[in-house]
Amino acid sequence: MGLISKLAWRNIFRQKRRTILTVMTMTGGFVLSSLSIGWMDGSYSGMILFFTNHQTGQVQVHKDGYLDNPSIYDTIDNYNSVGEQISNQDNVRSWAPRIYVGALLASRDEGVSDGIYSNSAAAAVIGIDPVMEENATDFSEQIIEGEMLTVSEADSSLRATGQILLGKQLAVMLNASVGDSLVLFSQAADGSGADRKYAVRGIVSTGNNEVDRTTCYLTLADTQLLFALENRVHEIAVMTTSLREVDKVAAEISLATDSVGLSTASWKIFAKEFYAGMKADETQLKIMLAIIIGVAALGVLNTILMMVLERRREFGVMKAIGTKPKSIVRMIVLEANVMGLVSVLLGSVLSTIGLLILSEHGMILDPPMDYGGFVFREMVASITPACYWIPALSVMITSSVVSLIPALKAAHTDAAKSLRTV
């Protein structure tokens, strides 16, 4: 250890109160930055997973042009073959086929004569494969009353009563509950009438009020038969093994299916409004993070500047005995860096404790937060490398940069004037 390093080390412990204050300031900045990053990453990851798992999927495959202008005629033909191609791609966890059509639903209140419908509502009909949808999105967790759809003989007989799931608000509009009957009126892809009687099997709450007010669900087989879409679907929703793999998986699927006239999009594209809103909020949080780091930097600057003013006589003696200005600068910067390193180590321990608590227990939102049409009742933090390296880098750079100003001031101290300082 050189002379300058020894002097820097001794100076750190010479004024313990000042050193503790500086370390506490930098540690506080580290902890606040780390918790903010963990909270931001965890919250947004949770939002994305909730959004994609409960409704959209993380990657979607459609007929070219369908996403911009949906039509009952723009279908994915022989979808099972396309699904096999998708399954063969790396990092694909599961996929689920879907059909999207529009219809009018009508129900009658108790005591109303046959043929007279007292309640009606336009609805988006989504045809799903019960087993594949459950594997992809845990759809049954959204059913708050009744049971999940099942594949039955009724799916292949339009004369039999089918089974239907209603969105929570849609059920209220139709005054329908589990076990009640209603009628669906629409038009099939071949121009024929698509009318059928259904029994309400369950009520669905996705967390998105708009979806729950306008959507009902049929089995895929039933929807294909009713709307003359045999072996065809409008969408294949894909779930990946990790959110980090979404863009890569979308690119690989696009390469594999582009030759058959299909387009592939990640959730960032088909849910661009949700993504844009999330990025705007993320920018605000980054600004807040910069403010936290800036406040900590000002605290460190103030402390080190006071330290330099208190040690003017010491620096005057050093200049008088021939110490070079750059050596004084190096000593002060080294002192700040050592305190910064201690702050990083201490801050890492405290941040880990805080992040573990927030990731395990999270925070209950009361009242719940409405974001992008979805209602979130709980937020949790996540522990990622960014929770440590960003605050650590910020603290070390800050301690080096803000210490330069006082260090340069000390290095250019007039020895004669400083020696006359009491």
Question: Language-model features: where?
Answer:
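C-terminal membrane-exit region of the final transmembrane helix in multipass inner-membrane proteins
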Residues: 383-422
